[in-house]
């Protein structure tokens, strides 16, 4: 094996060094802390979310095998029952009737047999006719080899699927055909091809620095055979974790499609979570069922410049098809961005973000994401603002709500675009660099304008979420940048030199593909104490930030709208709702 090129090695070093303790290149192991349990009485409420999914204590990461069975929603997730750092991982299991209120059950899968004795890692669920739901998951053997196993419910008549069995004929897929046994994990939901009678599923992997999604085929869901070629791969992308592969309708703008849909008017989505960057990328393309090949559309970037489900703190996502409502629903994990010491002291780490629906944008060139409508059942007191004109340097406070726990939806009208700054094409694939260069306090022509969240009254601490409009010189069309900037979010001083001792306060950014023909652009943010989920232009661009203010906490937090561009911007409409806690959120979880 030849050594990788110096440039690539240097890139890896940079990526790892800029990472935080959670959004890093690998799971960091803190053996002294991974079994340091916290009693329920000792769990710190500071920065703990109110309406997001999380257990009462300890560490969580990847959402696994979401599904609907006999009217009950199921979510499994990677969980450490003994501490607030990664380790001792089991498949925790929660159930819900409405995707809002959750009841914790006993862990469904945990290390117990030779084929998973050193780990039960991520996977997916598939509804198999005549067999019910089948979970495919990655097991870690005694010699640290990653293999693929299956588990089945003990009682199919139980809508809660409380008990799962791991049959002795596991594993079903082993890395014995040229695969990398140390990077071979996270099987997808399988899909069925009626024409040839085979099930198919993907497993993420890498070969040297090439990311790969291997395909496997089976008639009986037990004996799986590797396809002649991967469904897709890409050089210099490293390990592909948590792949997801599903169709979206080209014509139906309201409903999702089942994994096995093979009809007309559909495109396929291939999503991968890049272990190198800890971001998720997706492509839209065509899936040839005869050749088992997936080809991204020519206009869809493939690789590190690709489209993302979320441009912020968002990883290891997993979708499922809700056949009750005909929706494709997306779950995603947001780890903490504070320090390992903070996580250990507070006794918990990680949340699942609000589930989102997925549809194909009317352009056919990207997906759009939106919080599930069920979340609106938690809305309480509402305040509104209409036709509020903001000159350069002005900001207005949104009063009468609890800004640390709120759902705010605002539509801005930017009016005249003639004063928009000229767009520098050298930033065409570098929205983050542009956001860092032109932050919320850097005056522009049209923008920056947006929301100032989790702020003190004097802006000692604040997390701005904002737009800045540029003008493309060649086409004379607007180029819209969306940013969420955590750098000013907290006054906490970092004293350590190691990454685990420093709070991660990054900027996140993405471009928004919107024409602004009517001069309007919307921004919705779900704010929940230490998380800000923001949806630009009705979900064309989504950014999640984790933040930890020291003063803008609870009732001391403030919410503003602002404009720092020379061109006036009007708040055409703003609605903000206090958000209530669900009645149930995994009480009783171990």
Swiss-Prot record:
Subcellular location: Secreted, Extracellular space, Apoplast; Secreted, Cell wall
Catalytically driven reaction(s): Hydrolysis of terminal non-reducing beta-D-fructofuranoside residues in beta-D-fructofuranosides
Tissues of expression: Expressed in flowers, and seeds.
Induction: By aeroponic growth condition, darkness, sucrose, glucose and mannitol.
This enzyme's EC code(s): 3.2.1.26
A GO biological-process term: carbohydrate metabolic process
Keyword Signal part of the UniProt annotation: yes
Assigned GO CC terms: apoplast
Enzyme class: hydrolase
Sites carrying sugar chains: 118, 143, 180, 335, 564
Protein name: Beta-fructofuranosidase, insoluble isoenzyme CWINV2
The organism of origin for this protein: Arabidopsis thaliana (Mouse-ear cress)
Lineage: Eukaryota, Viridiplantae, Streptophyta, Embryophyta, Tracheophyta
